[in-house]
């Protein structure tokens, strides 16, 4: 992708970068509106994700995570921006007339052909079961349950690695560093998710961040005691506690939030790296 750097004509455009080749012109039959109750709250109105709210209205793009157009070749027609994820998406025209969106594999260009099935080439963008892949294959959009669609390694730049196959299971190393078992019958897509340099892009101004629905992050130590346990004091005072805490008084910075005795505990061979 071509990254365009704006000239320093105004403070808002100084060092701002955009991808000049990616457009946003979705097909009407592959989008639908969605009710945004957002702001990082759950059904009870409790904050579950901080610093969320506002942002531009979005139309949801229907992404084909299942890749169930078996043994039918498709051609990449467009590479588009998706406001609902940090990865780009591709519009695929299949030979039978079907049109679908998929995640954009890194290196794929307009005009490339892809296919999904059981005996397809090990080529970037092709989808096939893990049992038909050689060891060491880089993959993304990985199913956890067969037929449910890809659920792992879907973010921009994400890639997992097939490191072993034994019995009915395959061993994968996920982007987080976690090593876990998955059924060999589950499907995955060959290659890495595109838009690898998403973290190196510069938005240029605070307003661009607000368009994405991300609100400012305020440190607890500069708040009042009524707002945060770290708040209060004269000047730059210490937090007054042995360990940092959340605004609700729970331990912060590394507290484990995974449920105990989860069904998939016996499938995880090595926990993710911190």
From Swiss-Prot:
<dbReference type="GO" id="GO:0016740">
    <property type="term" value="F:transferase activity"/>
</dbReference>
<dbReference type="GO" id="GO:0005762">
    <property type="term" value="C:mitochondrial large ribosomal subunit"/>
</dbReference>
<dbReference type="InterPro" id="IPR022666">
    <property type="entry name" value="Ribosomal_uL2_RNA-bd_dom"/>
</dbReference>
<dbReference type="GO" id="GO:0009507">
    <property type="term" value="C:chloroplast"/>
</dbReference>
<keyword id="KW-0687">Ribonucleoprotein</keyword>
<protein>
    <recommendedName>
        <fullName>Large ribosomal subunit protein uL2cz/uL2cy</fullName>
    </recommendedName>
</protein>
<dbReference type="InterPro" id="IPR022671">
    <property type="entry name" value="Ribosomal_uL2_CS"/>
</dbReference>
<feature type="region of interest" description="Disordered">
    <location>
        <begin position="223"/>
        <end position="274"/>
    </location>
</feature>
<dbReference type="InterPro" id="IPR008991">
    <property type="entry name" value="Translation_prot_SH3-like_sf"/>
</dbReference>
<dbReference type="InterPro" id="IPR022669">
    <property type="entry name" value="Ribosomal_uL2_C"/>
</dbReference>
<comment type="similarity">
    <text>Belongs to the universal ribosomal protein uL2 family.</text>
</comment>
<dbReference type="InterPro" id="IPR005880">
    <property type="entry name" value="Ribosomal_uL2_bac/org-type"/>
</dbReference>
<dbReference type="Pfam" id="PF00181">
    <property type="entry name" value="Ribosomal_L2"/>
</dbReference>
<dbReference type="InterPro" id="IPR014726">
    <property type="entry name" value="Ribosomal_uL2_dom3"/>
</dbReference>
<dbReference type="InterPro" id="IPR014722">
    <property type="entry name" value="Rib_uL2_dom2"/>
</dbReference>
<dbReference type="InterPro" id="IPR012340">
    <property type="entry name" value="NA-bd_OB-fold"/>
</dbReference>
<keyword id="KW-0150">Chloroplast</keyword>
<comment type="subunit">
    <text>Part of the 50S ribosomal subunit.</text>
</comment>
<dbReference type="GO" id="GO:0003735">
    <property type="term" value="F:structural constituent of ribosome"/>
</dbReference>
<dbReference type="InterPro" id="IPR002171">
    <property type="entry name" value="Ribosomal_uL2"/>
</dbReference>
<dbReference type="GO" id="GO:0032543">
    <property type="term" value="P:mitochondrial translation"/>
</dbReference>
<keyword id="KW-0689">Ribosomal protein</keyword>
<dbReference type="Pfam" id="PF03947">
    <property type="entry name" value="Ribosomal_L2_C"/>
</dbReference>
<dbReference type="GO" id="GO:0019843">
    <property type="term" value="F:rRNA binding"/>
</dbReference>
<keyword id="KW-0934">Plastid</keyword>
<feature type="region of interest" description="Disordered">
    <location>
        <begin position="1"/>
        <end position="26"/>
    </location>
</feature>
